[in-house]
Design a protein with these regions (language model features):
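Juxtamembrane helix-loop boundaries in multi-pass membrane proteins
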Residues: 8-18, 64-78, 210-217
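Membrane-embedded alpha-helical modules
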Residues: 29-152, 257-362
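Hydrophobic alpha-helical interface/terminus motif in multipass membrane transporters
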Residues: 24-27, 62, 83, 198, ...
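Membrane-interface helix-loop-helix modules in multi-pass membrane proteins
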Residues: 9-42
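Membrane-embedded helical hairpins/re-entrant loop segments and their flanking transmembrane helices
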Residues: 1, 5-6, 182-252
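Helix-loop-helix hairpins and the membrane-proximal interhelical loops
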Residues: 1, 96-100, 130-213, 361
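Membrane-interfacial loop-to-helix junctions in multi-pass transporters
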Residues: 33-34, 68, 105-109, 169-177, ...
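Juxtamembrane transmembrane-helix boundary signature
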Residues: 1-16, 50, 54-55
Length: 362
């Protein structure tokens, strides 16, 4: 779909977005999978609206509504709001901490090895290995778990080779929409960076042709379509951009064939069953890094914009977003409820529009 919308001119690959992991976990626990899919489909619609705004007003219009002083703290909240889930899983528990699945000491060792492997590969890896540190961390953690008897292969044996994916269709839930919608801010900002990055590699200006409004529209269309089939949102994959630069292969058609291959793999039942055998501590160790990395992206967003966070206006906006988002503040009126990332994002946008710019204070 993305290649169709962008006229097969951008060699970039769409895959599942890590930015949505935390809100998806919370959404499934709170409202269930169908309602969460509704919120994720709305994220795609948000991309549509942004693409229309960019087409009519230009890319600078987005920065007026969502400047770094808003997007940075919101991205930080996304990474921090479910940090406890990663820690619980690293300790061998379920995400909410209610059930112990693996003895704590054993789980912490496995999580630490998985985390350390991921970090070391990202720092010291060469060539293709540097592009897949998370996969390396999972493989090493999985290998450590095998002799400890923490991997149950019975689901793989029961699964058939050919099987239809478990399609789940969205179910209307306005609260889920309000909670997940602000999360789309981070991938939207990342989208611009990835388009600039792939353009610098191929020496093409994709912001002009086919235009960032087309690339963002294609991203949104793919995200909404994935949600209607029970899948996670998509994002322009930075790892594949790195692979394009490494291999010097700029043909967008290769991305189309890669996408077709990924779709075909979804019909191999044993692959899905094998992924479900990954022990909880392995993913817990990885998620510590993933959620922390999302938070760091938020901090870096403000650093790159050279924001003076001691300026009273900037301090007020950032402080309200982070504390309200992480602290659990909620607003309820009848059946309407707003909390978490959704409330934090809306408060940030409103404060940015309402508070006067004032003078720059060092």
């Amino acid at each position: 779909l993305f290649q169709l919308v962008t006229r097969r001119s951008v060699p970039i690959f769409l895959a599942s977005s890590f930015a949505f992991i935390a809100p998806i976990i919370y959404g499934v626990q709170t409202w269930g999978i169908p309602s969460t899919m509704c919120g994720l489909a709305a994220a795609g619609v948000f991309y549509f609206l942004l693409s229309i705004l960019i087409k009519l007003k230009g890319p600078q219009a987005l920065n007026r509504i969502l400047p770094p002083v808003v997007t940075g703290p919101v991205i930080m909240v996304i990474g921090l709001i479910l940090a406890s889930v990663a820690v619980n899983m690293a300790m061998g528990k379920t995400g909410d901490g209610s059930t112990v699945l693996v003895p704590e000491n054993t789980a912490l060792i496995i999580a630490a090895i998985s985390l350390a492997t991921t970090i070391l590969v990202s720092l010291l890896g060469k060539g293709m290995f540097r592009l897949i540190p998370i996969l390396c961390g999972i493989i090493v953690g999985y290998a450590i778990s095998l002799p400890l008897g923490l991997v149950d292969f019975s689901p793989v044996g029961k699964a058939s080779w050919l099987a239809l994916p478990n399609f789940v269709f969205p179910e209307w839930n306005f609260q889920a929409i309000l909670f997940i919608l602000p999360v789309a801010i981070a991938p939207a900002i990342e989208h611009f960076g990835d388009i600039l990055a792939i353009g610098s590699i191929t020496k093409q200006n994709y912001l002009e042709s086919p235009g960032v409004h087309r690339t963002l529209f294609g991203d949104g269309l793919a995200t909404s379509m994935a949600a209607f089939l029970g899948g996670p949102p998509n994002t322009t994959y930075s790892e594949v951009t790195g692979a394009v630069g490494l291999l010097k292969v700029y043909n967008p058609g290769i991305m189309t064939w890669a996408a077709i291959f990924a779709v075909l793999l979804s019909f191999v039942g044993k692959i899905g069953a094998l992924l479900q055998t990954i022990p909880v501590p392995v993913m817990g160790g990885i998620m510590i890094l993933l959620f922390g990395a999302i938070m760091v992206v938020g901090v870096n967003t403000m650093i790159r914009a050279e924001l003076n966070l001691m300026h009273p206006r900037n301090m007020a906006i950032a402080a309200v977003i982070v504390v309200c988002g992480i602290g659990g503040m909620s607003f309820e009126a009848g059946e309407f409820a707003l909390k978490g990332i959704g409330l934090a994002g809306i408060l940030g946008v409103l404060l940015n529009l309402i508070l006067p710019q004032g003078n720059h204070i060092e």
